[in-house]
Each structure stands twice: as structure tokens, then as C-alpha cells.
Amino acid sequence: NDIYAGNNYGVFGKYTSGSRAIDVLTSNAPNYLPVIAAGNDRNTKFENQYLNASKNGYDLLTHDAVSKNAVVVAAIDGFTSYTNAGSVIMSDFSQWGPTDDFRIKPDISAKGIGVYSSNMPSASSENSYASYQGTSMAAPAVTAVFALWQQYFKELNSFVGLQNMKAASLKALMAHTASEAGVY
């Protein structure tokens, strides 16, 4: 998902030219809403040190995950029922903010552990599905919800000629219908 710098983690939490590029793009295309995986390296050690250790495990987002107009998705473990924010268990790998300008990111979380997904069959296995984990498994669930909302919006508003909700409306709907997650 990081289209700017393969293994280069950049400056944590900083609003970069890459972040700005996404915001300019979305500003010029008001129906376009990028959904970006937050990253999976929160507890990864490099040279015997956690990423951005000076921030005590926070402020780990880089590049496109710091953009203002994209929806950034964290990965959580699944849960059977929601009773309160403590019902939601954050994965031990999902990266999170805040950003250097104190915005709260990721914007939302979805199940990212034990997600059954398509798999490339190999010579040793013909199984076309496997269980995976990661923020790249959580982000498609959020994208699917947005697609369902768009479909419902079209069904409700087709008689007046409205085709799609704007990206800002989707983000607002997400923010106002999600339940608090975690005790962080």
C-alpha cells in the first residue's frame, strides 16, 4: 500500500509531500476516497530497537497514512459481541498515530487477524484460500462497507438524480456510526 517508499519508513507522523499529494488528488476528485492500510510494524524491532522507540510505540504512521483526506485502517482481532470499547482488542502489529500535528489516526479499525482470503495456488497446494493477518486484510472490509453505503444511497436517491455520496459524506457517516474501539 505504500506507493512512495518500499522499505523506507520516512519520518514518523510527518505530513510529507506524499501525504499532500493524496490530499490534492482527493480535493480535485471529491468522489474519490482512498482507503489505506495503517501498516504492520508496530512491534517490529530494527537494530534491537522498536520503530520510533522515543515515542513509546506511538506516532508510527508514515507517508500516505498521514494524509488528511484518506481513511486509514488499523487491524483488530475479531470479537463475538460488542459491549463497550474494551471488547475490541487491537492487534499487536497495527501501526497507529497520532500524527505530528495531533490528528488521531488510524480513522477506523476492522478485523485483520484470521481473515480468510484468496490465495495463489502453488505446486505443493491447490488450496485457493488461506487465513491471513494484517492491516491489508482489514482495509478491504472498510472499503466494502463504503461500497454498500454507496449502493444504498443510489437506491434511495435515484429518483432525484443523485449518483454518489461525496467522499466527505462517506467519512462523516463512518465517523458518526462507528463505535469506540479499545482502551487506548
State where each predicted segment sits.
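Substrate-binding/access-modulating region of protease and related hydrolase catalytic domains
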Residues: 1-67, 80, 100-103, 117, ...
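Flexible, small-residue-rich helix->loop connector segments that border functional cores
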Residues: 27-31, 94-101, 149-163
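Acidic glycine-/aspartate-rich tracts in secreted/extracellular proteins
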Residues: 41-42, 77-80, 113, 179-182
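Internal glycine-rich alpha/beta core junctions
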Residues: 64, 68, 86-117
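Alpha-helical segment proximal to the catalytic Tyr-Lys
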Residues: 73
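Hydrolase catalytic cores
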Residues: 110-184
